[in-house]
């Protein structure tokens, strides 16, 4: 039994897709366990970029199984579009498996997402308006429609009618909006279900059988720990659990079958949307990092907020997600800076704290306490060994590891697969 979970340790966009793609080379099954098409991940193969939102990164390996787990919420329209995109690019999808227990995002979820966000006014949480939150709301309220329901024409229509009756009351009476007619969406979405039917199965059986047979299984998280609904910067979070513990619920695999947790982070920090960000930069350095790092959302295209590396955030992520190994990405983005900073603690009302507060009011008053390190001017995008990094860059990498308290297994100096360098093989140490 060999299994590895890949989680983002910041607010998403840490390069999980790249690391998952890298680790997938030695895995036999790759599975996603939470989130939906609000999470974009970019894979670069031979200089060509592929952008995915639902399908696991392992789809580019035709000999491996890629799984959309039961903890995900699936927009069938987006999924069919993504499948068609892959087919047009010459990528086979015969190895895809979709959980029959995953919940379905429908047009009324997206409309409700939009209306709820608009109603918040200045208190918006920065949702991607993909219907993720409302779909998880229906799941928790036990009125959600699952993939298994979508495939049965009569059951799908019955449950769609029931849900539309409730949602339309909200649209018309609470939001003064237009009702959605069942005939406008039923046939379209039933047809999407028929197009994905060949991939649908009980994925928990596939995953557990693979682990019992000693196969290598890689679990791919979306978003990041700081967007986790329980452990993140609530309420500026997603509606699911990106932490490693989400694997057990979102894939149907017991916790005793998880061996290692790889935490993925950038050498700086970024965030899309609203919410606390203690190390955020508003100066020319921040603008430079954003441009050099191409910090624009894969899903939304929005400019990301950027800031210095925050070891307080990272230690929180390490603790709540049980991180055993670290993948440090985008070190090259910091090249050319005279000084680089790492947040080592916060100053809260004159008191030094080393943990991440739950209170948003306290977070607003937190001031980062920085440790400054000398920067480096060299182009490091061609570096393939740690010892070949400039001394100051090596010192930065080592200091990150010391402050987080986790050994670094890989470091990256660019977006391409061959720019990811191994310090310790995650698979061979199992």
UniProtKB/Swiss-Prot annotation:
GO MF: adenylosuccinate synthase activity; GTP binding; magnesium ion binding
Q: In which pathway does it act?
A: Purine metabolism; AMP biosynthesis via de novo pathway; AMP from IMP: step 1/2
One Pfam family it belongs to: Adenylsucc_synt
> Any S-S bridges, and between which cysteines?
none
- Which residues of this protein are catalytic? 13 (proton acceptor), 41 (proton donor)
Q: Name one GO biological process term.
A: IMP metabolic process
Which residues does the record give as substrate binding sites?
Answer: 298-304
The EC number(s) this enzyme carries: 6.3.4.4
Tell me the InterPro entries matching this sequence: Adenylosuccin_syn_GTP-bd, Adenylosuccin_syn_Lys_AS, Adenylosuccinate_synth_dom1, Adenylosuccinate_synth_dom2, Adenylosuccinate_synth_dom3, Adenylosuccinate_synthetase, P-loop_NTPase
CDD domains to which the protein is assigned, alphabetical: AdSS
Residues binding Mg(2+) are 13, 40
SUPFAM superfamilies linked to this entry: P-loop containing nucleoside triphosphate hydrolases
Primary enzyme class? ligase
The organism sits in which domain of life?
Bacteria
* Positions annotated to bind IMP: 13-16, 38-41, 128, 142, 223, 238, 302
Cofactor names from the entry are:
Mg(2+)
- Its quaternary structure? Homodimer.
Q: State its role.
A: Plays an important role in the de novo pathway of purine nucleotide biosynthesis. Catalyzes the first committed step in the biosynthesis of AMP from IMP.
* Family to which the UniProt record says this protein belongs: Belongs to the adenylosuccinate synthetase family.
Database matches in HAMAP family: Adenylosucc_synth
Record protein name field: Adenylosuccinate synthetase
């Amino acid at each position: 039994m060999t299994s590895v979970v890949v989680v983002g340790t910041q607010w998403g966009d840490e390069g999980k897709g790249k690391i998952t793609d890298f680790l997938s080379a030695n895995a036999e099954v790759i599975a996603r366990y939470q989130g939906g098409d609000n999470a974009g991940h970019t894979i670069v193969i031979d200089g060509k970029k592929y952008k995915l939102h639902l399908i696991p990164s392992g789809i580019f390996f035709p000999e491996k199984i890629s799984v959309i787990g039961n903890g995900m919420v699936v927009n069938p329209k987006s999924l069919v579009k993504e499948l068609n995109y892959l087919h047009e690019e010459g990528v086979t999808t015969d190895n895809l498996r979709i959980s029959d227990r995953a919940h379905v995002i429908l047009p009324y979820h997206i409309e409700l997402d939009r209306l709820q966000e608009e109603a918040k006014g200045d208190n918006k949480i920065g949702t991607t308006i993909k219907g993720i939150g409302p779909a998880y709301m229906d799941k928790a309220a036990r009125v959600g429609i699952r993939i298994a329901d979508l495939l049965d024409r009569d059951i799908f229509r019955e449950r769609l009618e029931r849900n539309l009756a409730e949602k339309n009351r909200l649209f018309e009476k609470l939001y003064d909006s237009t009702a959605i007619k069942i005939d406008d969406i039923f046939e379209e979405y039933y047809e999407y279900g028929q197009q994905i039917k060949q991939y649908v199965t009980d994925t928990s059986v596939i995953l557990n059988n693979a682990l019992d047979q000693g196969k290598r299984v890689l679990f791919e998280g979306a978003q990041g720990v700081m967007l986790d609904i329980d452990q993140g910067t609530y309420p500026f979070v997603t509606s699911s659990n990106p932490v490693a513990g989400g694997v057990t619920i979102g894939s149907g695999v017991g916790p005793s079958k998880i061996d290692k947790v790889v935490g993925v982070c950038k050498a700086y920090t970024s965030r899309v949307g609203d919410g606390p960000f203690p190390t955020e930069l508003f100066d020319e350095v921040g603008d430079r990092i954003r441009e050099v790092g191409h910090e624009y959302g894969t899903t939304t295209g929005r400019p990301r907020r950027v800031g210095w590396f925050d070891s307080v955030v990272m230690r929180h992520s390490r603790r709540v997600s049980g991180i055993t190994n670290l993948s440090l990405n985008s070190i090259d983005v910091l090249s050319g800076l005279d000084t680089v900073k790492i947040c080592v603690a916060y100053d809260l009302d004159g008191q030094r704290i080393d943990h991440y507060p739950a209170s948003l009011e306290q977070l607003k008053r937190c001031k980062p306490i920085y440790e400054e390190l000398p920067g480096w001017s060299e182009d490091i995008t061609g570096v393939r060994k740690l010892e070949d990094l400039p001394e100051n860059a090596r010192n930065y990498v080592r200091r990150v590891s010391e402050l987080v308290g986790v050994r670094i297994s890989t470091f990256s100096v660019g977006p391409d697969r061959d720019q990811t360098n191994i310090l310790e093989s995650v698979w061979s140490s199992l």
